[in-house]
Amino acid sequence: MENDMETATMTQDYHIANINLADWGRKEIEIAETEMPGLMALRKKYKNAKPLKGARIAGCIHMTIQTAVLIETLMLLGAEVRWSSCNIFSTQDHAAAALAQKGIPIFAWKGETEEEYWRCIASTLEGPKGWTPNLLLDDGGDLTAHTLQKHPELCQNIRGVSEETTTGVHRLYRMLKEGSLKFPAINVNDSVTKSKFDNLYGCRESLIDSIKRATDVMIAGKRVVVCGYGDVGKGCAQSLRAYGATVYITEIDPICALQAAMEGYRVVTMDEMADSADIFVTATGNTDIITHEHMLKMKDQAIVCNIGHFDNEIDIASLQDYQWMNIKPQVDQVIFPDGKRLTVLAQGRLVNLGCATGHPSFVMSNSFTNQVLAQIELWQYPEKYPIGVYVLPKHLDEEVARLHLERVGGKLTTLTEKQADYIGVDPEGPFKSEHYRY
């Protein structure tokens, strides 16, 4: 594989694992398109107008089959792109190959080193003939931070960034507060059709998929701790309970904790569950959630995994001096001095993309339709967005939902003029206030 990657780097403007996987990738992309009605609707609506003509987008999102559909949508709307993955394990090599074969600059492969990861990001910021980006599309904030810290000279020409995930949004707000954010940002994560669908329904399916693929373990009857009860944690807890697990929740937020209790989950602390649970899932977007001390208490063959964006929720670094036995890709057993074995999935990185293929295409169509709309907003209406962090307006959020409803057989009721007047809305929407909690 190394020789193939070296050859690719020298002869083409891409860096991937294996170009021979392209045909397989193309077949899966075509299947995914049938499950991504939002993106396909945007292609149809804007194919002639080309609202992204002139846009040069540097992207950093998991290089999956679904992301391939996003990339090709951006290009059909007029954009040029250069792309890397936001996680060293999340790339689907056949997806990367399918795009590279079409001449799209992709810098991603499954199993990158940390050094290679940052080199791939750097490759998206510089292209042939002086190519540099004027828009960013990010997931987790690494591309944004790298641009601000390593390439400040690019910032004056960047109209903005659209950010995909909770962790990246936290970083954006911190940068804004510190004064280090030099261009506007659209917080895609907090669009209702992203956070209440991708984060919840996506994780509800992909967590179980990844644990089963990695371990073949029976979920029914297991005691499982889910750390965090935001939208991601809610989806994880629902799926685990549906499979017959006894689910325990850890939380810092009393509102989320009370929600968990009202759903019938036990709200506990890691300290009290570390020595008795069978499976641990972190879903907080925070650091040091499962510590070395917690793992010392865990029983033999306990399974530890993370579905938050970064790999610092579980203190994997503290285990490096122990013996590691690789079972299969992204599945390791850590053997403690007393002989206890702890099963670690994806080295503490995103388990659903490290050990499986991530969220299903349909729910990613929700998220990525928001991304395309955010890119159009930043490109077409820069005067509306001084430096700051924004969310997409409610009418666009509702439009994303509308584009997906028919695909699942849904039909909307139409308000009469009298009904619309009674509740004070336009018959065509938006139907809720900006502060409404879905």
From Swiss-Prot:
Q: Which residues bind NAD(+)?
A: 165-167, 199, 228-233, 251, 286, 307-309, 352
The note on cofactor binding and number reads: Binds 1 NAD(+) per subunit.
Q: Which GO terms describe its biological process?
A: L-homocysteine biosynthetic process; one-carbon metabolic process; S-adenosylmethionine cycle
Catalytic activity annotation: S-adenosyl-L-homocysteine + H2O = L-homocysteine + adenosine
Q: Which Pfam families does this one have?
A: AdoHcyase, AdoHcyase_NAD
Protein family membership: Belongs to the adenosylhomocysteinase family.
User: Function, please?
Assistant: May play a key role in the regulation of the intracellular concentration of adenosylhomocysteine.
Q: What is its main location?
A: cytoplasm
Q: Which gene name does the record give? A: ahcY
Which residues hold substrate? 64, 139, 164, 194, 198
Q: What PANTHER family does the database record attribute to this sequence?
A: ADENOSYLHOMOCYSTEINASE
Look up the record and report any one GO term of the cellular component aspect. cytosol
Q: Name the enzyme group at the top EC level.
A: hydrolase
Protein name in the entry:
Adenosylhomocysteinase
Its keywords, alphabetically, are: Cytoplasm, Hydrolase, NAD, One-carbon metabolism
- List, alphabetically, the InterPro entries matched: Adenosylhomocyst_ase-like_sf, Adenosylhomocysteinase-like, Ado_hCys_hydrolase_NAD-bd, NAD(P)-bd_dom_sf, S-Ado-L-homoCys_hydrolase_CS
Cofactor names: NAD(+)
Q: List, in alphabetical order, the Gene Ontology terms for molecular function in this entry.
A: adenosylhomocysteinase activity
Q: Does the keyword GTP-binding apply?
A: no
- This entry's Enzyme Commission designation comes to 3.13.2.1
Q: Where in the cell is it found?
A: Cytoplasm
User: Which pathway does the record list?
Assistant: Amino-acid biosynthesis; L-homocysteine biosynthesis; L-homocysteine from S-adenosyl-L-homocysteine: step 1/1
